[in-house]
Amino acid sequence: INAVMAGCRPEFLPVVIAALETICTDEFNMHAVLATTMSVGPIFVVNGPITLDIGMNSGINVLGHGNRANSTIGRAVQLVIHNVGGGGPGGVDRSTLGHMGKQGFCFSENEFSSPWPSLAESRGYNSSQNVITAFTGEGPRLVMDQKSRKPDSLIRTLAEHLISTTSSRVVVGMDAMLVLSPEHAARFHEAGWSKERFLEEITEMMMIDVDNIIAGSNGIEEGLPAAMKGMTLPKFRPDGLFLVQAGG
């Protein structure tokens, strides 16, 4: 019923069901996603042949409107959360500002024209399998770099933006999803970078000198305890940066 109300075609239903099965796990913890006061929501990335079969968008305006499959799959999941799970604002949902992902946020990766492994392949699946990844995210936020033509420059821009995720003073206890556009991805592909090299180098660039983010430093009360001075910590958890290629 909720899928019909969202405008899904019958062939979208396997993806809707897979998305619901994914978030209804202890590992994902949908209750925590709703109950937090933070502005986050579930994001779904779909990989595999089904993305072509049902006409999902992985290209121009991939995170926006205009594609029935992308829009209605995400919306159907949110209607189930609200109508079946009781996850409405002011009830279970306690977000201070909310998140547009709670209207519906689903897209496919542009995996068929990239030399790099897809998100699903990086997670241990093969290209013939249909896979959905559920991720709790804020944003999205734009990373603008119109001048870098070499990967060594562009990756520094990306790292600089990623460090500010949630707050530049929050480290280790979070993940992030980086959606790399074709133009930016091409800088790395043409230079012969592998996905593994990209992730290794950007992770190294996001090692944080804790002395700069101790509570009270630079007149900011937010930060880490003084007992952690002298430490160097990663911005994200190990394997906590999810790299997706999409857009036009």
Residue positions per predicted region:
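Non-transmembrane, aqueous-exposed alpha-helical and coiled segments at domain scale
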Residues: I1-G248
